[in-house]
Design a protein with these regions (language model features):
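Non-catalytic accessory segments flanking enzyme active sites
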Residues: 53-57, 62-65, 91-93, 124-127, ...
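Short glycine-/Asp-/Thr-/Trp-enriched loop segments that recur within the blades
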Residues: 20-40, 117-124, 204-212, 248-254, ...
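Short, solvent-exposed loop/turn segments at conserved positions within beta-propeller repeat blades
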Residues: 86-90, 143-148, 228-235, 272-282, ...
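A short beta-strand motif characteristic of beta-propeller blades
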Residues: 30-32, 113-118, 197-200, 242-246, ...
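Short loop/turn segments that connect beta-strands within beta-propeller blades
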Residues: 99-102, 155-158, 240-241, 300-303
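Residue position within the beta-strands of beta-propeller blades
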Residues: 51-55, 136-140, 223-226, 263-267, ...
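Residue-level detector of Asp-centered blade-edge/turn motifs that repeat once per structural unit
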Residues: 47-48, 132, 218-220, 257-260, ...
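Predominantly five- to eight-bladed beta-propeller fold
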Residues: 2-44, 51-113, 161-169, 173-183, ...
Length: 359
């Protein structure tokens, strides 16, 4: 902040100084991500716990709003950064942290790498996912949310620790102190940890709907993405770029992805998916499975699908191994319900992983 000749502060220089200092947050989602994109996480562990992706953002470019507490008139108004139309958003960055462990498995430090993408063209970090055995995935969008990119983040090789026990160093008690060194691999240009490559790009002249749970890898490495299919008037899913979910079954959320199927929350559009084409389980109450009902279904990659909830209502599900948990309520129910289900073989034992039909 500088004083002018008449003794007043130069507002332009004051703003520049404030912007340079910034209002940085680490490990949190910026306001636009949480409020508009349903992304509330700001850091993501790798499945093997050897890496961490974390967000940092500078909110100093956003407008400041002052919010009072109507229940407590004596309390001063609180300042909050708030993104507004036609003004700057938070400046979002992503960092890949490689974690180092000694020979006893104790953490001793890490190496940080900036995750690189075209942040000027794609300023929204809409989604992050990390599937075991695969690189992390990012979904980034432009300001108008008419274009997006699905990116894979290169993580490189894990830090290698080499122990050197006979070093002559001792602590204050005279005990020998183990020392070690780390081997940092060399990478070709463009393959360094934190670099990204584009897997898919999508465009829509109107608007690209976000579908929670996408993008995602199947365990065997196929890429599942959202598709706003304007020709079919349906929000669909693709696997390696090919749409496989039915016309008229609007995918609202992906709950789980396996090599055999995806578990989804869907809404049916009757004009596009008539009652005659519905599975037997929904035939008796087909008229109620429409945009009012959020149903859980399993959809295979060949397009076959089956409903996993029968009563129209608001439903979701989680599954792991041989079990699943269904939660929600029907349209006539005031209270939430929870059902635990287990896939069991005819002999009463839990089904094997390669015997998912329970026979």
């Amino acid at each position: 902040v500088a004083d002018t000749q008449d003794g007043t502060q130069d507002d332009a220089q004051s703003d520049a100084a404030e912007s340079q200092a910034g209002e940085w947050k680490i490990g949190l989602a910026e306001f636009a991500a949480g409020e508009e994109m349903d992304r509330y996480d700001g850091f993501w562990w790798s499945p093997d716990s050897k890496y961490v992706l974390f967000e940092t953002f500078d909110a100093s470019h956003e407008q400041t709003w002052y919010i009072a507490d109507p229940a407590d008139p004596t309390k001063p108004a609180q300042a909050r950064r708030y993104p507004q139309a036609m003004t700057a958003n938070a400046d979002v960055h992503l960092t890949l942290l490689e974690l180092g462990y000694d020979t006893d498995g104790c953490y001793y430090g890490g190496i940080a790498h900036n995750v690189e993408w075209d942040r000027e063209s794609y300023e929204y970090l809409a989604a992050v996912s990390w599937t075991e055995g695969h690189e992390p995935l990012l979904l980034v969008q432009d300001r108008l949310q008419q274009h997006d990119q699905v990116l894979a983040v290169h993580v490189g090789e894990p830090i290698v620790t080499m122990s050197a026990p006979e070093n002559g160093f001792t602590d204050e008690d005279g005990s020998e102190v183990e020392t070690f060194s780390i081997a940092i691999p060399e990478y070709a240009p463009g393959e360094e940890p934190g670099t990204t490559r584009v897997l898919e790009e999508h465009s829509n002249d109107c608007w690209l709907d976000l579908i929670a749970g996408t993008p995602a890898y199947t365990p065997d490495g196929r890429l599942v993405c959202a598709m706003n299919d304007m020709d079919a008037d349906t929000n669909r899913l693709t696997v390696d770029g090919t749409p496989f979910t039915p016309k008229g079954l609007q995918v609202r959320e992906v709950l789980d992805v396996t090599d055999d199927d995806v578990l989804c929350v869907v809404q049916r559009t009757p004009e596009l998916l008539p009652a005659a084409d519905l599975p037997f389980l929904w035939q008796s109450n087909a008229d109620d499975h429409d945009a009012r009902s959020f149903d859980v279904v399993s959809i295979r990659y060949d397009g076959d699908w089956e409903p996993l909830t029968y009563v129209p209502g608001q439903w979701t599900m989680s599954r792991a191994g041989d079990g699943c948990v269904v939660t929600g309520r029907g349209m006539d129910d005031a209270a939430m319900q929870m059902q635990h289900c287990m896939n069991v073989r005819a002999d009463g034992a839990a089904a094997d992983a390669d015997d998912a039909d329970g026979n």
